[in-house]
């Protein structure tokens, strides 16, 4: 874990964190409702795994992610996920063919909310702290996802606790989740409504030894 934190922090510094602010050990924070664009990059090979719009209900712990039609360098259908963390399930939705899969979510951790066990590492300025409106103050957090043996490195804004980016790593993958065009509201609450063709779909069991979580879903696309 310590080696991972040091390596991840080094990457962050290279991305433009120019001024180190004194850390005061902030309390764990909670993200607001959000609508925005999420881009997922595989750091090995530099492949964009997915990019699309999302809505996040931070109260009821729901995410709807719909992959952008501009991401067309793939042969399969565009990804459309409805993740219900309180229920511990997600739906893989195919609007074109009106089909749906329902599977278990084995972890509540994801890139749009600071996980409960996250440990604060440092507070940083992105940009310049001496030029007005040319800096963003962020908190850096690290932690692990025991269910998938993954480790993460997550940055949130100081104040509203908006997640900016998340590095997620296991023995086999390293992904970067970038959050942009964020609006602190759910613009269309109906996106959390289950399509009629998904109602009554039976839960599919994951293959033995496979653990499904937010991060692994994007590694499979």
Swiss-Prot record:
Protein name in UniProt: Ependymin-1
PANTHER family the record matches: EPENDYMIN-RELATED (PTHR10697:SF5), MAMMALIAN EPENDYMIN-RELATED PROTEIN 1 (PTHR10697)
Signal peptide (residue range): 1-21
InterPro entries: Ependymin, Ependymin_CS
UniProt superkingdom: Eukaryota
UniProt note on tissues of expression: EPDs are synthesized in the meninx and secreted in the cerebrospinal fluid.
Stretches assigned to coiled coil: none
GO cellular component: extracellular region; lysosome
Entry function: May play a role in neural plasticity. May be involved during axon regeneration.
PTM description: Binds calcium through the terminal sialic acids.
Protein's cellular compartments: Secreted
Glycosylated position list: 33, 73, 97
GO biological process: cell-matrix adhesion
Family: Belongs to the ependymin family.
Molecular function in Gene Ontology: calcium ion binding
Keywords per UniProt: Calcium, Glycoprotein, Secreted, Signal
